[in-house]
Amino acid sequence: MNALHFGAGNIGRGFIGPLLLKSGFNLTFVDNNQAIVDAINRHQKYDITVVGNNFSYITTVKKVKAIYINDPNIYFKIAKINVITISVGVHAINSLVVFFEKLIRYKIETNDFVFLTIIACENVFRCASKLKENIKILLPGIYHKYLDKNISFVDSVVDKIVCPNDKNNSDDINLSVKVEKFSEWIVDCTQFKHDRPNIIGMIYSNHLDAFFERKLFTLNTGHAIAAYLGLLIGYKNIYQAILDPLIFNIVYGAMKESGMVLIRKYNFFTDSEHKNYILKILSRFKNIYLTDSLKRVGRNPLQKLKKDDRLISPLIDTIKYNLPNANLMKGIAAALCYIDEKDIEAKKLRNMIINKGIKYVLSKISSLDSSLLIISEISIYFNIFMKVNI
């Protein structure tokens, strides 16, 4: 069995790729970074350091190869693929539409009727379904029957904290990564048109929407708020931030607020189950050996402030269900304070706030009604955070 993984980044190398190899697939990474592609093909292996508060061990991933996405012979080289997984990031996912449209054409023209499963592993709601819709818009109608019959687009939720390992002193790309032991990969069991791939660690569910928002509203929400608050104080890593009692209380409070939304919205998680889930995530954040940079977690703040992302989406639902949201508002205010001259989105956000104000940003970027009282409340927290430490 052959598998491709698009995106030879942290999640690809540290989570999805190793599971595919462990499950018996021949794995090829596809990436738009020629240097990473060359490094993978040169070494054909890399190390994963698994760390916890009382353990650390190294595993070596072997027999890996990679191909540059703009290789002129890529469609020939990846023929007869059985499984494609994707973790390229929110901003890059749409760039794959043209690639997959051409791949489908190539499969038809070469009489390739091997069933293909495409699984999106992104922090985007129903990412694979959206990808399929966009491909169909581009793909001529005469090819739609082939797509619908032979290709499964499967949505999933992935959860594992993966960090780049320490840089080495050579000019070579350091492929090694550092990961936590915890992992979760849940896929929508209703979207497979043919036999499900036998992948170790994959969980099949028909409640994917609930699991997606559980992860987004809890891990991603808490992660982001811890990062933005930590940066205000001057911390560097997630574990430093979450060990600060004041930050911990706000993050824990925000997670409980978003948790009340999930319990009310889905009637699927119990209070005790979700409390344990929150506490498990907080313990993961406290892993002092997982040096997860606050700037890495906080990067691309405009994306994180969109209405369907980790900060605004749970806030909107607290309004809908008339639930508490003070800690979520504090987290959003901290995100608005984010400054990083190397982050294009952070610079845009800063300029928008200076020139247009908070109300404009939350209306334009977050699609919040400018008349909402919470905008004034977020503005108050923002002004406090900008003047003094928390």
From Swiss-Prot:
Any one Pfam family match given in the protein's UniProt record, by short name: Mannitol_dh
GO MF: mannitol-1-phosphate 5-dehydrogenase activity
Signal peptide per UniProt: none
GO biological process, one term: mannitol catabolic process
Keyword Oxidoreductase: yes
Cystines in this chain: none
Catalytic activity reported: D-mannitol 1-phosphate + NAD(+) = beta-D-fructose 6-phosphate + NADH + H(+)
Cross-referenced InterPro entries: 6-PGluconate_DH-like_C_sf (IPR008927), 6PGD_dom2 (IPR013328), Mannitol_1_phos_5_DH (IPR023028), Mannitol_DH (IPR000669), Mannitol_DH_C (IPR013118), Mannitol_DH_N (IPR013131), NAD(P)-bd_dom_sf (IPR036291)
Keywords noted in UniProt: NAD, Oxidoreductase
Binding site for NAD(+): A3, L4, H5, F6, G7, A8, G9, N10, I11, G12, R13, G14
Family: Belongs to the mannitol dehydrogenase family.
Protein name: Mannitol-1-phosphate 5-dehydrogenase
Lineage, top ranks: Bacteria, Pseudomonadati, Pseudomonadota, Gammaproteobacteria, Enterobacterales
